[in-house]
Each structure stands twice: as C-alpha cells, then as structure tokens.
Amino acid sequence: MPPGWEWGEGMDENLVLKNRLREARAERGLSQAGLAELVGVSRNTIRSIETGQFNPTAKLALVLCIALDKKFEDLFYF
C-alpha cells in the first residue's frame, strides 16, 4: 500500500460495477432463469445484475465467472 493511502480514499461508494453478464449468458445459450438455477439465485437477481441495479457480492461474482467460464475482468468492469 502506498504511504499515506487509506482504504476507500478517493473511492465512490456508489460506483456501479458494470458487466457483460447478458452477453456471456447468451454465448452459453442460457436464459436468466437457467443461469439463476445454475448459480443458486433468483431470476430477478440475475436481471438486477444485468441491468446494473444490483452489484453482486464477491462470492456471487466468482460463481458467475465459474458458471460462464469467464475471467472476472472479462465479465465485470468499472
């Protein structure tokens, strides 16, 4: 950590994590419901992530990456 740097310094707590979830899901031929069942969440959760209304937890983001065979940086960005 750089000297004098504090965790969260200069970070916007309202920053939206953008994603390519819809595209990755389509590449796999999965519906929102199909992906939701695969990763153990509701279809509404998948929809909310795809539309940017909800940021997934680190655990859910990792599970989505595994389910869609994508690296984190290929699926999520700022």
Functional labels for PLM-detected ranges:
Residues 59-74:
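DNA major-groove recognition helix of helix-turn-helix/homeodomain DNA-binding modules
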Residues 48, 77-78:
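Phosphate-coordinating loops and pocket residues in cytosolic domains that bind phosphorylated ligands
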Residues 19, 43, 58-62:
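Short alpha-helical elements of helix-turn-helix
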Residues 1-22, 27, 33:
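N-terminal flexible/basic segments that precede or flank functional cores
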Residues 51:
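Short, conserved catalytic or interaction motifs in soluble domains
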Residues 29-48:
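Short alpha-helical DNA-recognition segment
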Residues 26, 37, 66:
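Alpha-helical residues within the helix-turn-helix
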